Every structure is written in C-alpha cells, then in structure tokens.
C-alpha cells in the first residue's frame, strides 16, 4: 500500500491520490531531481494486461500538445508504473453537469480543436491510431482553455490487413454501431461518430443514444447547419459519415464563419438602433425647443 511521501523509483515523491479505478490508481508525484509534477499511474501486477501494454505502446508514439505525454515507465514488486503529463483542469462531463449544455460558438471552437487532435491521431504512421472512446468525460479543459484528450485504454492501431476487431470496445451512448457488434471493424470513421455524439451532448445536454427525440427544432440558420453536421457524423453506416476529421473541420469552419457574419450583423443592427434612438431624441428635443420659442 502506497502512502503520501513514498518515493517511487527513487525519484517520484507521492503528493496525493488523484483517482482510483478498476485497474489501478493515479498519483500526483513530484520528480525530486527536477522539481516538476507528473501523474503516475500504478497498475498492480495482476491487472497489467495486454490491453494496458497496448495503451502504453500507443502513448509512447504520440507527441501533441493536446495529448498526454508518457515520459517514464518502470516496475517494482507492487506492479507497473506509467509516468505521464499531469493535466490540470476539468473534464467536460463535469462542466455539463453544472451547466446543462453550451452555446453553439463554444461547441464549434471545441469541436475544431477535437478535429485537429483526431487528424493528428489518424495521420500517425505506419499505423493510424483510432481513439474509439471520445466522450465529455475523456476530454479535459485545461486552465489555459485548451482541450486535452485522455484515457487511451481502448484505443487501437489501425492495421489494413485486419478484417475485424479482436474485442468489443466503446461506451454506449457514444459508441458507433460497429463498436458494439461482434465482428465489427473500427476505423477513423468510428472516431467521427464518437465526435458527433460528443458534439450532440455539448449542444443538447445529453448523448444521442440515451433518449429519443432527435434534434431540437430550430429556425436559426447556424443551429440548423451544425445539426446537419452532427447528424451526418452520426450516420449508422460508416460510408454515410464524413470520411475524415479534416472534412468535419472544414464544415465546422464554415459554421464559425457564419457566426462571425451573424455577430457582425447583430452589432451593426445594434449600432443602427442606437443611432436611431439618438436621432429621434434629438428631433424630439428640437421640436420641444421650437415649441417653447413659438409661445
């Protein structure tokens, strides 16, 4: 049993327990040699499965500002330890529980960031990384207002010669149909579906797979457009979805441009209304003054 103050691998001093899950615990630790802080995952020996080693193998290959970075791996008699970036912030699921949903401009900006992350993962060579578990609880909003994707526990390397996945993986409510059927094959279009489910919840306060009702009716052109984008991401058949994260990004950028235009239009209308009020006030004042002088 590890305690606060214990030294791991001779240099990582445990400061506090960050969290505990089914496969192990995560501690905030200070590197006593460098003085910086890291998140250290401890996985007991009997829990260190092939899936765990696969996650480590994937994370070791990645280097992106919006992804955790693995800097050290070691073992002792108590199990396996993974030292990675300490992400300070709040996950989007916690924010949703407080707020209910988010304004469309915020969702568009966040979704553009998520598209960039997926574009990076899908561009890894020789084997692209399929994340497979995008959902609000796996997305951290840092203190610097940047999104970071966490928990690569069910991610996989996409190998073109494989015809099906070796195990079912995904979170109901966010998972694409191919993630939940035996013999299904996940690829980058699976991540597009997960992205669509996440966008849906950020906009409407619930994931699309939990309640019936579809999209909230709207006459707003921006909302109609983004609902169309989300709807295409959520197509049951992979060939009906956007095929690349870049395709989704381009569509979202067009929505962002619409928001800019609409914002400029609203500001112009507001200024004209102010000018009109001022002019009418001046006219009213002039009429009043003229009336006084005519008496």
Residue map of PLM features:
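Activation-segment/catalytic-loop signature of the eukaryotic protein kinase fold
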Residues: 73
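Conserved N-lobe ATP-binding subsite of Hanks-type protein kinase domains
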Residues: 25
């Amino acid at each position: 049993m590890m305690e606060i103050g214990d030294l791991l691998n001779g240099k990582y001093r445990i400061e506090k327990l960050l969290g505990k899950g089914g496969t192990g615990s995560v501690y905030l630790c200070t590197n006593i040699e460098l003085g910086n802080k890291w998140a250290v995952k401890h996985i007991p020996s009997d829990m260190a499965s092939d899936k765990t080693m696969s996650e480590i193998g994937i994370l070791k290959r990645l280097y992106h500002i919006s992804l955790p970075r693995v800097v050290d791996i070691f073992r002792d008699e108590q199990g396996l330890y993974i030292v990675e970036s300490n992400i300070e912030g709040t996950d989007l699921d916690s924010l949703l529980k407080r707020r209910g949903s988010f304004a469309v401009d915020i969702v568009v900006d966040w979704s553009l960031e998520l598209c960039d992350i997926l574009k990076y993962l899908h561009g890894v060579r020789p084997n692209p990384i399929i994340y497979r578990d995008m959902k609000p609880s796996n997305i951290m909003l840092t203190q610097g207002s940047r999104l970071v994707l966490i928990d690569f526990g069910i991610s996989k390397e996409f190998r073109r010669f494989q015809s099906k996945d070796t195990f079912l993986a995904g979170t109901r409510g966010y998972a694409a149909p191919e993630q939940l059927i035996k013999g299904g094959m996940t690829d980058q279009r699976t991540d597009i579906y997960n992205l669509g489910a996440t966008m849906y919840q950020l906009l409407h306060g619930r994931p699309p797979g939990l309640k019936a009702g579809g999209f909230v009716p709207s006459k707003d052109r921006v909302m109609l457009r983004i609902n169309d984008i989300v709807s295409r991401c959520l197509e049951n058949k992979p060939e009906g979805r956007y095929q690349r994260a870049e395709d989704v990004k381009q569509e979202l950028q067009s929505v962002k441009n619409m928001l800019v235009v609409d914002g400029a239009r609203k500001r112009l209308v507001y200024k004209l209304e102010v000018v009109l009020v001022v002019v009418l006030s001046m006219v009213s004042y002039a009429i009043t003054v003229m009336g006084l002088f005519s008496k």
